[in-house]
A protein has these predicted regions:
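Short, small-residue-enriched loops and turns at beta-alpha junctions
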Residues: 41-46, 98-101, 127-131, 158-161
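Histidine/lysine/aspartate-rich catalytic loop segments that bind and position anionic ligands
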Residues: 87, 92-119
C-alpha cells in the first residue's frame, strides 16, 4: 500500500494536484518528497513532459516538497525540459540517472540538469564490477554537480541485483573519503 493506504501513487498525485484539497492536506510527519518511478515499463515514454507531470512539480514546489526522479537514461533531457518550466521545484535524480555507460548524450543531459540550481544527484544505483566505469562515473558526477548537491543512497536491497551493498558502499566511501556532506549533511 502507498501513503494513506492508497493502491497507486497516481491517486496521491491526483490528490496533490487538487488545489482545493492541497491547501488543507497534511502529509505524515517525515514526508519530504514524492517519487514517481519513470523508468519502469508501465510509465509511458515522455511522461515527464506531460502537463499533469509539470503541474505536479508546481504543487510540490508550492508545498516545499521535493520530487525524486528515477528516469530512463534517454529521457533525462525530457526531465531537464520539464524542470526548466518549474525552476523553484527541488528535484533529486536517483541512481546517477540510471546510467550504465558514459556516452555523450548522458553527459550532455546530466550537465544540463546540473546547471539548474535546485537539482540534486543521488550517488547510488550503479554497477560496481567495472572499476574504471565507477571511477569515470564518479569523476563525471562530482565534476558536474556542485559538491553540495551530491548525496549518497544505498539503494538497498535493490543494489544486490547488480552489486553488493558492501561493494557499492565501499566504492563511494573510498572515492569521497567518507565525506560527511555526501553521506549525511547534503540530504538534510
Amino acid at each position: 500500500d502507498y501513503i494513506f493506504k492508497l493502491k497507486s501513487p497516481y491517486i496521491l498525485a491526483r490528490v496533490m494536484r487538487a488545489r482545493h484539497l492541497c491547501e488543507h492536506m497534511r502529509l505524515p510527519i517525515g514526508i519530504v518528497g514524492v517519487r514517481e518511478p519513470l523508468h519502469i515499463d508501465s510509465s509511458p515514454r515522455g511522461r515527464c513532459l506531460e502537463r499533469s507531470f509539470i503541474q505536479g512539480l508546481e504543487v510540490l514546489a508550492k508545498q516545499d516538497l521535493l520530487f525524486e526522479s528515477c528516469n530512463r537514461v534517454d529521457e533525462l533531457e525530457d526531465l531537464y525540459n520539464s524542470i526548466k518550466q518549474v525552476p523553484e521545484a527541488k528535484v533529486v535524480i536517483n541512481h546517477c540517472g540510471n546510467v550504465s555507460t558514459l556516452d555523450d548524450s548522458y553527459k550532455k543531459a546530466m550537465t544540463k540538469l546540473a546547471s539548474l540550481p535546485n537539482v540534486y544527484c543521488k550517488v547510488s544505483g550503479f554497477p560496481t564490477d567495472n572499476k574504471v566505469f565507477v571511477k569515470n562515473l564518479l569523476d563525471f558526477i562530482s565534476g558536474t554537480f556542485d559538491h553540495s548537491r551530491l548525496m549518497y543512497a544505498s539503494n538497498y536491497p535493490v543494489v544486490n541485483l547488480y552489486s553488493s551493498f558492501e561493494d557499492h558502499l565501499n566504492c563511494v566511501r573510498e572515492y569521497f573519503n567518507d565525506d560527511l556532506d555526501i553521506f549525511s549533511k547534503n540530504a538534510k
